[in-house]
Regions:
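Auxiliary Fe-S-binding modules of radical SAM enzymes
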Residues: 1-15, 75, 204-305
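Flexible, acidic/Gly-rich N-terminal and inter-domain linker regions that tether
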Residues: 1-52
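Conserved, mostly hydrophobic/aromatic
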Residues: 21, 50, 91, 146, ...
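Core AdoMet radical
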Residues: 58-77, 81-171, 179-184, 209-214, ...
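A general structural detector for well-ordered alpha-helical segments in enzyme core domains, enriched
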Residues: 74-77, 105-113, 132, 166-173, ...
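Conserved strand-turn element in the central/C-terminal portion of the radical SAM core barrel
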Residues: 95-99, 170-194, 213-228, 249-260
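Catalytic cores of alpha/beta
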Residues: 129-138, 189-204, 259-271
Length: 305
């Protein structure tokens, strides 16, 4: 889609933009809302300086910090995620790399989840090498999560300890070993609309399978604590633009959906979203699972009418 076409879309009233996005979803995406859950398997003490993240050791956010959970805890989290209706469990660890021992524990946990729980396993484990990713792929890790976070232009404004290209390199490595890829980012960090469009276009070029959209939750102690959350209207328009640009890809609502969208979460699924994270996030909680189940039932019913 050309820049002129994108500018034309940006000028549309929200209702018209949402209508185009919903038509795109109905034509290209199966009418079923996808659910996933995560486990924060290793928390805090990260050496990276991502301005938005409470887990960076360079910030003063008050969070729980702990080393990698054992295999049994991770497998149990997969069972709980399955019981809440999630089709996937994302195992998430803080930090940019894994030790050899951590990699071994995660490979064993992944294999046991596949063998005994029966839920798809994803990993968000940092900038792993192709060899490390191959080990996890052989253990049954089906999808790798590695957000690009924002546009290439804006990336250096939020992180200085690694580059945008390094994110791309890890995604390419995951694809090279045969994994699916989940990659998106955070909206509301001070980026422009053109940055959001550029981010969506990069994800389209990378041909990722799933795109999580987070909305910044300004956490005390982080470098972005003083930022205001974006408006519900801007959030809805962003979701719609991503659907129009990304076509048939899964667009998954993640952190911040409750605080930004509030009572309008249902509208996000009329604006192009077709998936969401359930059961809480890394350092902040989510809605009650029962409330999300009611929303899922209503959306699935509406989509199949």
């Amino acid at each position: 889609m050309s820049l002129m076409q994108m500018d034309s879309l940006l000028s549309l009233p929200t209702a018209e933009l949402v209508s185009i996005a919903d038509k795109t979803r109905r034509e290209l995406v199966p009418p079923k809302l996808e659910l996933c859950g995560i486990i924060n398997a290793k928390s805090g003490l990260c050496s990276e300086d991502c301005k938005f993240c409470a887990q960076s050791s360079r910030h003063k956010a008050e969070i729980s910090t702990y080393s990698l959970k054992d295999k049994a805890e991770i497998v149990r989290a997969a069972q709980i995620a399955k019981e809440t209706g999630a089709e996937r469990l994302g195992i998430v660890t803080s930090g940019n790399r894994l030790t050899e021992q951590e990699l071994d524990v995660l490979a064993q946990a992944t294999q046991e989840i596949n063998d005994k729980v029966g839920i798809a396993v994803c990993g968000s484990l940092g900038a792993l090498t192709k060899n490390e990713l191959g080990i996890l792929k052989d253990a049954g890790l089906s999808r790798y999560h590695h957000n690009i976070e924002t546009s290439p232009r804006f990336y250096s404004q939020i992180v200085s300890t690694h580059s945008f290209q390094q994110r791309i390199d890890t995604i390419d490595s995951a694809k090279a070993v045969g994994m699916e890829v989940c990659s998106g980012g955070i909206i509301g960090m001070g980026e422009t609309w053109q940055d959001r469009i550029a981010m969506a276009n990069v994800l389209k070029e990378l041909d990722v399978d799933s795109v999580p959209i987070n909305f910044l939750i300004p956490i005390q102690g982080t470098a972005m604590a003083s930022l205001e959350t974006i408006s519900c209207n801007d959030a809805i328009r962003t979701i719609a633009l991503f659907r129009i640009i990304l076509g048939h890809k899964t667009i998954r609502l993640a952190a911040g959906r409750e605080s930004v969208l509030k009572d309008f979460q249902g509208m996000a699924f009329m604006a192009g979203a077709n998936g969401m994270m359930i059961g809480g996030y890394l350092t902040v909680g989510g809605r009650l699972v029962e409330e999300d189940h009611r929303l899922v039932k209503e959306i699935n019913s509406l989509w199949t009418e």
